Amino acid sequence: MPATGIFADSITKIKNTIKALGLVAVTDPRNARPLTCLIEMPTYTQFTNQVADISVVVHILATPPGNQESGDYLMTTLDTLMDSELAITGGSPTLVVIGAQELPAYDVTIRIGAQR
């Protein structure tokens, strides 16, 4: 059964925005691969039972090894996301382990205010 509610709606908004930018967005780690954006589960701060401040980390994944070519891809993709309607509050370069492989990545935090 697919998820419903404000958390699922927030993930869907992020995923659709990333796709509209011509990027590949995935929510299932089994489908994560280089040149995709892996959307993590949300964290949140609740104000009332009707309002929440939702944060979602998106991993921009590049091809190994972590050389200049992958760095260029990460910075270009990050710039594309920053130029969108997404409310990006921060980010940092990292390595993401998918299966047994380390992928160069950039972790981007996106915030969404959600209301029922």
Where are the model-predicted features located?
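Charged, amphipathic alpha-helical segments and their flanking helix caps
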Residues: 1-27, 40-116
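Short, well-ordered secondary-structure micro-motifs within conserved domains or adaptor modules
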Residues: 31-41
